[in-house]
Amino acid sequence: MYHYRVLNSASSRGGVAVVELDLSAPRGTGHVALPFTGSLGPSRRDVPDHVPFGAIAPERWLMLVDYKARLVWNVYAVLLAEGAPVSFDSVAPGSVKSGFGVRSPYLPGVRTFAAIPTEQSCCTKPNAQGELPNSFLFRVKGLTVAPTVRPPDMSLAIVRSDLQQTCGPLRWIADGAVCGRLRSNLEQAIASQQGDRAATTGSLPAFLAELDAQHGPGKPVSDNAYWLLKVNGEYLLAHM
């Protein structure tokens, strides 16, 4: 089970009304649906393949699967006789909304997500043509951790690639010394993988222990980096 919370910065100028999460998968994966908990709206059937998944939504939020195999959470809204729709709920600036979740047997990888503001945050004033702007034009994109890898496909090479991303462009681990220790332990596990199983099962726990030691308030390993590397590393250790 993947649990999420949406944090809207205090400097934001609008509430969040829609969250999109990419769950697409290579052709041939299929369209396996697991249970959904909460309000499920009409979903498209002509979507690309996606990882097997179900989802959870907070109260007054709706779920659906869109034409790009994205899981979409959106707030209930009321359509007024005049003007833009008004959201019943949102993630206001400076607030946090929990209760979002994805259930899937797939292991984590780096995925794209997007947040879209409420209509009343961005789109209540007509433009020069007398038209109201579309809130989807104000989409803000980012990266998170979500179901990606089929368990039999998980490998130390994938964990190494994830570590390179978290210590590199993602900056999910911003401490170079910590990255160096993690990289050293992981490289030892990879080097010994073909020969000395005992060495591999010794280096991998050291990698996981370093993650544990460096994760928490004020520490350099972010939640995204921790759960991405921890879950995949523990899976490999358990299946060696």
For each of these PLM feature ranges, what is it?
Residues 1-150:
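Extracellular or exported targeting regions of proteins
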Residues 146-240:
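Soluble extracellular-acting proteins and domains
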